Amino acid sequence: MYQFQQDNRYFIFNFDRTFEQASEFFQAEFWQKQERVIGSAKGRGTTYFLQTEDWFGVNCALRHYYRGGLLGKLNKDRYRFSALETTRSFAEFHLLQRLYEAGLPVPKPIAARIQKGKLGICYQADILMEKIENAQDLTALLQTQTLSKETWMQIGRLIRKLHDLQICHTDLNAHNILVQQTEQGQKCWLIDFDKCGEKSGGFWKMQNLNRLKRSFEKEVGRMNIQFTEQNWADLTAAYHQ
């Protein structure tokens, strides 16, 4: 782990050294010039998928942090600075590293950056993380096929492991679960841990699960995904084992 500063930019890398191109790593234009952009996905902004296995050991996803809602129309990507470790990208980096070290199937964090404005009051943020290969988000997959009972149970066990660590995924929904096709079968991953973190007690855990169920029910109507009450029963049975 290597943390350093260049002028008004702060970096953390999951390596024991720095890179001359540290700042360029967080610019899509740099990767486009290198002809290393291998795909992209649209959300609040564009996430770029990068061919970086020869540099970082894995291919990466590059994401810039954008605000949502009405506030996002007035201020699309600036956040108030209070402490480095609580900035959006550094906080997500450290949480992903904690979960990765605990053995949960989450993307390995590669690097994070914040860039302060001239007055040092606000900052912009970016993160580089592992790209999960041969994977689709659950909603895309469920538009074309059903999942086995074992895969639904795998999702339930995964969420239980997360909750046992007292980590609340505040945006737990069907889009933030990836299903990867491997030689051993389907493997489920959790992604997008922005604004997530540790939460004490247990009252919130069923609320978190119910949030996930509502997202499935919403996508049944919106995207015509294949989801049944039996699927949910299999998921929750594994969660409660």
What are the residue ranges of the model-derived segments?
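Juxta-kinase regulatory segment immediately upstream of eukaryotic protein kinase catalytic domains
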Residues: 1-38
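Conserved ATP-binding subdomain of kinase catalytic cores across diverse folds
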Residues: 25-136, 160, 164
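AlphaC helix of the protein kinase catalytic domain
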Residues: 137-145
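Conserved alphaE helix
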Residues: 150-158
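C-lobe/activation-segment region of protein kinase-like
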Residues: 182-241
